Design a protein with these regions (language model features):
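Hydrophobic/aromatic packing residues within the alpha-helices of TPR/SEL1-like helical repeat arrays
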Residues: 516-517, 555, 589
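Start-of-helix register in tetratricopeptide repeats
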Residues: 533, 567, 604-606
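"A position-specific structural signal for the A-helix of alpha-solenoid helical repeats
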Residues: 537, 571, 608-610, 646, ...
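Residue at a conserved register position within TPR or TPR-like alpha-solenoid repeats
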Residues: 542, 576, 613-616, 651
Length: 696
């Protein structure tokens, strides 16, 4: 199968002015989104925020960041070209904004971490595949963990109180191998399944990557990951012999290892470095380079992959002009030298500050040390001196009175990191590249300026982009999505469910407005639609509007396609709880439990809550299911798994009071909280919103 994938870049924005607030920055993101419309033709997104562009891409504001999602591409050269087109588009939009108003220029950054607020953003990746998501996740994990030797953005450890270089700062924010959340409790693999296509197409979504500036780093990130996914789809097992005993621990270990020599433990009991893991994966790709399931550019990718690993093995510092983290490390060392410091001295200060914090609060050291700048405040400084800060520093060859100089150095390094990825002429990477001191370019990237306004030719982005260009003059009559363009006035829609569709096929309108939704759910209604995700949302709409028959037909059709089997059976169980059909509730809960092996942790937890409820309603002992739930929650350690909401939400009128009271009591006993207040903002159908103890 031909590869198909895309990338998202999250841009940090700082509004004009001496002290812009978060609200100012959010307003700037919205204004910049409007300015993009004046740079390239655009249509409003049909379901959700943002706009789709004439190059097939999407731009939108999410969590105070302006995001640009590339159109679907088929090779790493296109991936780099359209990622750079996003940068170019933002730069042009800023110029457009300045020319049309008296406001000062806002600043846009391709960054990944806010060290002061300990927040992260970066770059998401989406890949088309056909294997089961759980299989892909397991087989891809060793590659994702070890690829940061060439995909790391470089920066600093956000949890260190001083200054500690990190190959990949964002990696240190990943807490789980898998997670359904992208805002809190992040996982290396994002488990939310949103295909955005029809048939057997599945979409792998990764949130562990970083925004990059080096063409070589960007190219390698996409090329190598596509090859590993192709091998998995082809029936190979890239993780054979490389499964990690602790994927998150290994990810963090490699992220803190600029020498590329740290060994991590494998499930087999053996140990391996990131470079050794990468070489074994590369060898498998080389051995199957001519297989029909591999892209036709596999050999070219393997040559560049091997050359990069060889370079890192000889001396990681040799990447000081080619890879993001190598370039940054060399740049930071120049800043250190200008301040009369070096990595060893910075490490001594970091160690001293850790000891100072521990001495100041021996009864309960903070999980995350406060910013060392707070030690410059008089009260904190006095406490530190009383705790023996001077002695702590002397033992490390430091002088406590020099702390202000170290804090100033830290600020300078953080500013350097931020400015590295700034768009426009103020960016340090742009400055270095313009000076000709870097060697990061990749041959064959092509015309970036053309990619700002024109889509790729070999995917459905071609049809989408062409439609946007032709229809943008009538923005109130048309809306767009990844898998459709909708004409409300003409009652037609452009079907883009086929990822490689390159010809426009307008069809009669069947989904999208209330009348059409009702019509689609009637017996004999046409089955064509916008894909299984849309049918799931349509079923939700029917359920919330009391159309239980329509919801049932849609959900049963999803089961016939094996779409999210455990989750869909759970939806049907909840529907029949509402209608009072106990026998069907039992059936679908049992079916959901049988399909649990392929389900995310939060779906398994929901199924267990339903098992407990069924046992309670049937006057049976629910304790075995309660014990299973407790064990599952302890193992999954995923806050979204705590939601009892499918059992409670909108069911208070259909549950007998004793059963409801028992469930509430049980929930408080397990979760230690009041579930009702946490369920108000939780969307049971999609699993998004607030769960106990977490926000998303």
């Amino acid at each position: 199968m031909k590869p198909l994938f895309g990338l998202e870049t999250e841009y940090g924005l700082v509004a004009a002015g001496p002290t812009p607030s978060a609200e100012d920055n959010l307003l700037a993101a919205g204004t910049l989104l409007s300015a993009i419309r004046r740079v390239v033709p655009a249509l409003n997104a049909d379901r959700g925020a943002g706009i789709f562009l004439a190059n097939g891409a999407r731009a939108y504001v999410d969590a105070h960041h302006l995001e640009y999602a590339t159109p679907e591409v088929t090779d790493p050269w296109e991936a780099v070209r359209y990622t750079l087109a996003g940068d170019r588009l933002i730069e042009r939009a800023i110029e457009q904004w300045i020319h049309s108003s008296d406001e000062e220029r806002p600043r846009a950054f391709k960054g990944n971490v806010d060290y002061v607020g300990r927040q992260t953003w970066g770059s998401h990746e989406s890949f088309l595949h056909r294997r089961h998501p759980r299989e892909v996740s397991a087989q891809l994990m060793p590659h994702l963990v070890s690829r940061i030797v060439y995909t790391g953005a470089g920066g600093f450890d956000p949890y260190a109180p001083g200054v500690t270089f990190a190959v990949s700062p964002r990696a240190l924010f990943m807490e789980y191998p898998e997670s359904s959340s992208s805002m809190e409790n992040r996982g290396i693999v994002h488990t939310k399944d949103e295909p955005l296509a029809s048939g057997a197409c599945r979409r792998l979504h990764l949130i562990c990557g970083e925004s990059l500036c080096s063409e070589k780093s960007m190219w390698l990130k996409s090329a190598t990951t596509v090859l590993v996914i192709a091998m998995i789809d082809g029936g190979l097992e890239p993780a054979a012999g490389l499964a990690l005993a602790d994927p998150v621990g290994a990810f963090h270990g490699f992220a803190r290892d600029p020498a590329c020599t740290v060994e991590v433990r494998l499930s087999s009991g053996a140990a391996a470095t990131a470079l050794e893991m990468q070489r074994r994966t590369l060898a498998l790709a080389e051995a199957h380079a001519d297989a029909p399931f591999m892209p036709d550019w596999t050999r070219a990718a393997c040559r560049e992959w091997r050359a990069t690993l060889d370079e890192l093995a000889r001396d990681p510092r040799s990447t000081a002009t080619s890879l993001d983290w190598g370039i940054k490390r060399a740049l930071f060392e120049r800043v250190l030298a200008r301040h009369g410091s070096n990595w060893e001295l910075a490490a001594a200060w970091t160690d001293a500050l850790k000891a100072v914090w521990a001495a100041m609060r021996p009864e309960r050291p903070p999980a995350e040390p406060p910013d060392p700048e707070t030690l410059l405040e008089p009260v904190e400084a006095a406490q530190a001196r009383m705790a023996g800060a001077e002695a702590i520093c002397r033992r490390r060859g430091l002088t406590w009175s020099e702390l202000p100089r170290f804090v100033a150095l830290r600020r300078a390094l953080f500013e350097c990191d931020m400015r590295f990825g700034e768009l426009g002429e103020r960016g340090l990477f742009t400055d270095l590249d313009g000076a000709g001191v870097l060697s990061h370019r990749v041959a064959g990237i092509g015309d970036v300026s053309s990619a700002v306004t024109h889509p790729p030719a070999t995917t459905r982005a071609r049809v989408r982009g062409k439609a946007v260009r032709e229809l943008a003059a009538n923005p109130l009559d048309y809306t767009c999505d990844w898998n459709c363009v909708v004409s409300a006035r003409a009652n037609t829609w452009l079907d883009l469910n086929e990822p490689f569709e390159t010809e426009a096929r307008w069809q009669p309108f069947r989904i999208g407005r209330a009348a059409s939704l009702q019509a689609l759910t009637q017996p004999g209604a046409p089955s064509a639609d916008w894909g299984p995700s849309s049918r799931r949302e349509l079923a939700r709409w029917c359920y919330l509007n009391g159309n239980y028959g329509g919801a049932t037909r849609l959900l049963e059709a999803l089961l016939a396609e094996d779409f999210e089997v455990a989750s869909t059976h759970g939806h049907l169980a909840r529907l029949y709880l509402t209608t009072g059909d106990r026998e069907k509730v039992r059936h679908h809960v049992a079916q959901a439990w049988d399909a649990r092996a392929d389900a995310p942790a939060y779906v398994v937890a929901r199924t267990l809550w339903l098992q407990i409820l069924v046992a309670t309603l049937d006057s049976k002992d629910p304790q075995p299911w309660i014990n299973t739930l407790k064990t599952h929650l302890a193992r999954s350690n995923e806050p979204s798994a705590w939601s009892m909401e499918p059992v409670l939400d909108n069911l208070t009128d259909t549950l007998e009071l004793p059963a409801l009271a028992m469930m509430l009591s049980l929930y408080r006993a397990i979760a230690g909280d009041d579930p009702v207040s946490d369920l108000d903002e939780y969307d049971w159908w999609t699993g998004e919103g607030r769960g106990v103890g977490a926000t998303t």
